[in-house]
């Protein structure tokens, strides 16, 4: 088992991509600590709350004494300029950017030799749809935070981010245009992200830090103009 007895922290690990990541680490022998707002057999808490982050970090260190891998995955909102309130926008940034920064700070002196931080961003850190400002701003923020932390923690902790594209967390299989619009010929699933997380956390990625890796089946490389290849903008 590649991660036997390694201590792994996953935020937002109750469902979706975070759950898949946590389960993959556990199968490889890791000791996995999860924090989520959903009730379950993990640390229950709101990542937007400073005191909760401090209690969670204290709990991890008290139980495990170190951190080998920190995966900042949690992200709560998807609202845009028409509907998103000031408070909702601030909350999205608190969970999506402030919490990853503060957890890195809280664990700074407890990271083991060769430790790794993996931040989950989004392909929306480089492209957008209307009415997605709260989510997009947070994902752009965590992508930038990644290279800043990589510089500050150089020689101690490797820090990288992953930008998923369309990931169906139910592992649904799509056909037709939904699939063919991707160069890879399909929609992604959580294992596509979990596999990269485990690679980046491993010694095989020992020379990779400060990087952002987009996993979107090639979608963001698909240059689209009206009337090209049957694409039509109806507006």
Describe the residue ranges of each PLM region:
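Conserved NAD(P)H cofactor-binding loop of Rossmann-fold oxidoreductase domains
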Residues: 73-78, 218
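Substrate-binding pocket helix/loop in short-chain dehydrogenase/reductase
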Residues: 80-90, 178
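Active-site helix of classical SDR
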Residues: 104, 138, 146
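Alpha-helical segment proximal to the catalytic Tyr-Lys
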Residues: 109, 150-155, 206
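Residue(s) in the substrate-gating loop at a strand-loop-helix junction
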Residues: 122
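C-terminal helical subdomain
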Residues: 161, 176-208, 215-217
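Short C-terminal tail/terminal secondary-structure segment
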Residues: 209-235
